[in-house]
């Protein structure tokens, strides 16, 4: 088997799934299927759960005729869980699973914050609350900041070592093994060792097990943390183009190419970029 001309590492929320509706546009699925059918390897590198990715991305691709040998893998919960489209078996790293008190705290807090968010109970390793789709972003953002403050207070009261952005609150041993990570539509409690770089390494291992690896990659994301995918691949000596679909626009000064889709953001930009990769 010859090495494919390029591979894809895709964040899901934003580049693939709409942050507003949490659904995937049909044309994007069609183009992704075409790329997979032509042997392009694809890794979905996301904070989403395997349940979400299997239902919203993999199942619709299967309905469209996903080939049995398609090289499609999902690394979820920022590297803590993963699944391959071929067998559907979900794997999890127990060392990246948050303590039960994190889930218990979310269930307690949601009683006061259910007007703006809900608990994502599909997560296997992380503990997550997500914005309700019927709540305006500015309302969710305000409530999220209040929630995050209460969450931090609860986790530190439970004597967990935790980090929120640049603030560190060590445990009795001086460690901060856990992280609160707010995003546009969610707040995650996760292992500090997790992240998009770990997801990229897991994705490479999954691809290496089913065929040759390309030496050129397109990574697509909507947050600054998604650049870690490109950093990881560039560090291997591969040719990388990172596509930033966020409203903020791309970073400058990276050692690899960074681009955007003029006039488009989120899933519209992701769909347009994937369409442009199709052979003419």
Feature map (PLM): residue ranges:
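Short, hydrophobic/glycine-enriched beta-strand segments
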Residues: 6-12, 44
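A short acidic (Asp/Glu
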Residues: 53-57, 129-133, 227-232, 254
